[in-house]
Amino acid sequence: MIFYFSGTGNSEGVARIIADRTCDQAVSIVDKDPSSYSFGEGDRVGFVFPVYAYAAPEMMVEFARRVEVGEAYSFAVCTFSNVTGDALEHLGSFVRIDSGFGVKMPDNYPVLNKILETEESAIQKLKAAEHRINEIIPKIQAREAGVFDTLRGDDPHEKSSKGYPWFNENGRSTKPYWVDEGLCVGCGLCERMCPAHAIELIDGKPIWAKEICSMCMACLNRCPREAIQ
């Protein structure tokens, strides 16, 4: 079984491709009870997630640490746009991981006021990601252990998950979010896909009902009208 956490779809896409090629099942961890899953010798368990602040998202950490991996072969795949930092090691401090891999995907984090992908660069990254996944799958099928193939970055101290507690405390506020009511059509997609259930539709318009969210960027990236700012 392959568990994934995905906001914009990058990690979900990777998880589903791997699951399809390995005759496995891809399962979103959102609203799932980790204690309802247990595995043993001969089983295979995967965790696929995006890199947040050079670490694993809190929702993935809280899920993985409560899953009974047992003697199953356990692997992790993290998706990233720049470098992975020590995201796999971070998750590995909560759950046993036999091998881990990184897959570079298009950037979808507009919070830092930077220019995201052009269509051309996104297509190039997706093609490279397909090749990368094809490299990873045989290693998973062979249950290779001790393989940690990621892109940590030039400065392992700078690209460290040590800053993740700060991100959790200060970087997940919903206060900056707002909706352009001239563009919003009240479709409710943002409310339905928010993994933190932080969005509610009031009078046909989204409001952020929680002070903290996952900062997954699903609402920003998937709004069909680009109404969420």
Locate predicted features:
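FMN-binding flavodoxin-like domain, especially the glycine-rich phosphate-binding loop
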Residues: 2, 6-13, 20-32, 37-49, ...
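A short, structure-level motif marking secondary-structure boundaries and short turns
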Residues: 76-77, 174-176, 204
